[in-house]
């Protein structure tokens, strides 16, 4: 899985320069081998070997160049059918040294097993693939050169079925990424040379039949993890108590003897995770014996603790203090050491740290203005930051020349991804000479009925030019100074998705921050300055009147790959539909679209507009009381041949949803092996059971809403 939202899949629509050359009368084969190899590197491996290679002698030779076949990436190659993968392995398997089949959930174990033919493999990523213990054993027994492995551990896994040859291979593995769907050590005890361990805990508290699972493992001398050479430990937990129980068993061994070479220790836990005696011993040992360059801890381990001031860091590149009650004073004193040079820091996650830009957390209210001197110190010390997350907090700037949050962040010229709360980009506190905007939800009930926005002038034409960004806007200036930004998130500080993980759908959300009322179409239009933008999230912008700024983005952000829009404008009416339809005409490279909006009508007009996105692969719609037209969905899927994921959660009846889902699968499954369709009522009590069957790659990347900037360290996994 790509970290921090990075897109590492093959990009065959980047071959346009060659097409342009041919239009000028230059034949493709007239280019040098070096240029041709660069062009061919953007062609999916299956297409390269099974099709392009057979066109002529020159391409036949180039397609077998080591630079193209030593590393094969099949993740997100949704056209990679069973036959294609088997044929690919048969033809170049012996040459492949690095193979990623991450998220290839549609391939059966019998096909994945063919990886055993790639005997030169050094790295292989099989996360999301179906493999039994016996098949894994057979495959690993043949891969004697393997040093990096990523697998899933599913119910039924039995380490006793692993052969001695398999265990010999595992003993040489230095990097392991293991996604756990059942309480287990997996293959960790067999990996006696581990230097990097990544653990993803996705264990559900109950079985499908409702039985409560136990997190206890059979712990014996033979199945204790070996951590003596460990340099990187990373654990990410999905919600649920059982994931916390199991991770404690992994941590218990670390607390007995902390590896001296440990330099990255990261635990990502939603909610609270109580500190135990063993974890306290581990942290004390780390403070005494190790020097870290990456750190993330559960908020309950840091809140009220002096731990940070005892930790030792050397050229740190990643910090995450997400949801911690870290004050700005502590941030400066304990992390930045009063302004110490932290030019090495590449990624910083302060999401949900509501007091991190204020000197003291005890006397501050959430809506109080920030202390700009703290942010100024942070910016000066961490001048090479590439990824910064300040979402899920109220970071309000006071009046003051050059002291606005946007003006200070504009100094971070190396930023490539940025996540901000909507209220933080408002120009300033409302002035006496400016009529205040009417809050979108304050004057209306918060039940299921449609909300009527009062005190707002009638909407102008979406294309009247009123969304042109104002050069005097601090947000406009910020984006002007960050022209190479690739990932931008503007998320309302009070926003919560209607579809959380492992819980019923949320029926109501908190009203937006009052400062967010002055952020609307003009600010959205300013995003059009970002010519290199690839990923965009806009959530809870109540003052979007027409969505005309979206057209600006569609016209100018031609690199846009993923778009997530949630709760824009008035909650009782989708006011931006005409603008969105016009925007989509220009999104030729858009692959992922997620829309979350109450009362959204997924009608023929919407799907007709969506059909103009030729690269679209994944669609997710979440709409309380929303409607859809089954015929329009079927026609859209017939026109858009690249779409392999269609998730629609609306207010339609269960019968309507089931009928449409069956029709889609019956019509398109045979031609699209990776097709994943979920059509289900958003507020139905069975939603949790439906979600558990969604492939993790889709669930994690698009179906569930979350901030993805600085979510993980850069380049955590290849």
Curated annotation (Swiss-Prot):
Keywords from the named record: Leucine-rich repeat, Repeat, Ubl conjugation pathway
GO biological process, one term: SCF-dependent proteasomal ubiquitin-dependent protein catabolic process
LRR repeat placement: 77-103, 104-128, 129-153, 177-201, 324-352, 367-392, 393-422, 468-492, 516-540, 542-567, 572-597, 599-623
Highest taxon of source: Eukaryota
Record bears the keyword Nucleus: no
Domain (F-box): residue spans on this chain: 25-72
InterPro entries per record: F-box-like_dom_sf (IPR036047), F-box_dom (IPR001810), FBXL18_F-box (IPR047948), FBXL18_LRR (IPR045627), LRR_dom_sf (IPR032675)
Keyword Repeat applies: yes
GO cellular component, one term: cytosol
SUPFAM superfamilies assigned: F-box domain, RNI-like
Its biological purpose: Substrate-recognition component of the SCF (SKP1-CUL1-F-box protein)-type E3 ubiquitin ligase complex.
Subunit structure: Directly interacts with SKP1 and CUL1.
Family matches, as PANTHER family: F-BOX AND LEUCINE-RICH REPEAT PROTEIN 18, F-BOX/TPR REPEAT PROTEIN POF3
Protein name stated in the entry: F-box/LRR-repeat protein 18
Organism: Homo sapiens
Gene behind this protein: FBXL18
């Amino acid at each position: 899985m790509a970290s921090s939202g990075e897109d590492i899949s093959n990009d065959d629509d980047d071959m346009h320069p060659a097409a342009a050359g041919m239009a000028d009368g230059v034949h493709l084969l007239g280019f040098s081998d070096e240029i041709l190899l660069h062009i061919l590197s953007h062609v999916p491996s299956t297409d390269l070997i099974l099709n392009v290679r057979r066109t002529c002698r020159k391409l036949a030779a180039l397609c077998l160049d080591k630079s193209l076949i030593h590393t094969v990436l099949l993740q997100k190659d949704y056209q990679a059918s069973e036959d294609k993968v088997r044929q690919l392995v048969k033809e170049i398997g012996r040459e492949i040294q690095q193979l990623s089949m991450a998220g290839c959930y549609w391939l059966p174990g019998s096909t994945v097993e063919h990886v055993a033919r790639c005997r030169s493999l050094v790295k292989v990523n099989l996360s999301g693939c179906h493999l039994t213990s016996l098949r894994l054993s057979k495959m690993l027994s043949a891969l004697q050169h393997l040093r990096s492995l990523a697998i899933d551990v599913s119910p039924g896994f039995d380490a006793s079925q692993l052969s001695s040859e398999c265990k010999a291979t595992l003993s040489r593995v230095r990097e392991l990424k293991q996604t756990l769907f059942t309480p287990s050590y997996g293959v960790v005890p067999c990996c006696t040379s581990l230097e990097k361990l990544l653990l993803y805990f996705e264990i559900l508290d109950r079985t499908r039949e409702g039985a409560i699972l136990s997190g206890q493992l059979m712990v014996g001398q033979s199945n204790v993890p070996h951590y003596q050479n460990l340099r990187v430990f990373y654990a990410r937990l999905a919600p649920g108590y059982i994931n916390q129980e199991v991770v404690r068993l992994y941590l218990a061994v670390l607390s007995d003897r902390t590896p001296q070479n440990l330099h990255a220790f990261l635990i990502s836990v939603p909610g609270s995770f109580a500190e135990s005696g063993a974890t306290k011993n581990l942290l004390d040992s780390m403070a005494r014996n190790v020097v870290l360059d990456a750190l993330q801890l559960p908020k309950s381990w840091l809140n009220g603790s002096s731990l940070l001031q005892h930790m030792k860091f050397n050229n740190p590149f990643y910090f995450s203090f997400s949801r911690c009650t870290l004050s700005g004073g502590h941030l400066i004193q304990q992390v930045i050491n009063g302004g110490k040079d932290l030019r090495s820091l590449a990624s910083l996650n302060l999401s949900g740290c509501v007091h991190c830009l204020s000197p003291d957390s005890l006397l501050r209210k959430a809506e109080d203005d920030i202390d700009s001197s703290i942010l100024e110190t942070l910016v000066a010390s961490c001048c090479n930051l590439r990824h910064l997350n300040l979402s899920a907090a109220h970071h309000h700037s006071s009046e003051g020349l050059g002291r606005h949050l946007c003006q200070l962040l504009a100094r971070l010229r190396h930023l490539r991804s940025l996540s901000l709360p909507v209220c933080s980009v408002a120009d300033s506190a409302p002035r006496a000479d400016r009529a205040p905007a009417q809050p979108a939800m304050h004057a209306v009930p918060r039940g299921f009925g449609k909300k009527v926005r009062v005190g707002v002038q009638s909407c102008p034409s979406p294309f009247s030019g009123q969304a042109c960004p104002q050069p005097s806007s601090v947000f406009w200036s910020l984006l002007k100074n960050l022209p190479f930004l690739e990932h931008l998130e503007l998320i309302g500080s009070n926003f919560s998705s209607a579809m959380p993980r492992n819980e019923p759908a949320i029926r109501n959300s908190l009203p937006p921050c009052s400062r967010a009322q002055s952020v609307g179409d003009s600010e959205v239009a300013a995003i059009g300055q970002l010519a290199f933008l690839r990923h965009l999230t806009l959530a809870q912008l109540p003052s979007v009147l027409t969505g005309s700024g979206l057209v600006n983005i569609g016209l100018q952000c031609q690199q846009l790959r993923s778009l997530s829009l949630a709760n824009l404008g008035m909650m009782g009416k989708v006011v931006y539909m005409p603008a969105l339809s016009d925007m989509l005409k220009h999104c030729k490279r858009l692959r992922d679209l997620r829309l979350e909006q109450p009362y959204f009508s997924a009608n023929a007009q919407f799907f007709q507009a969506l059909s103009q996105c030729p690269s679209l692969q994944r669609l997710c719609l979440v709409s309380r009381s929303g409607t859809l037209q089954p015929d329009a969905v079927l026609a859209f899927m017939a026109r858009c041949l690249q779409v392999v994921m269609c998730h629609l959660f609306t207010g339609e009846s269960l019968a309507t949803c089931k009928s449409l889902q069956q029709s889609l699968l019956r019509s398109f499954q045979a031609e699209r092996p990776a097709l994943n369709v979920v059509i289900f009522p958003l507020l139905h009590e069975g939603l949790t059971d439906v979600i558990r069957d969604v492939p993790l790659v889709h669930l994690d990347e698009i179906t569930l809403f979350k901030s993805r900037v600085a979510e993980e360290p850069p380049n955590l996994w290849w």
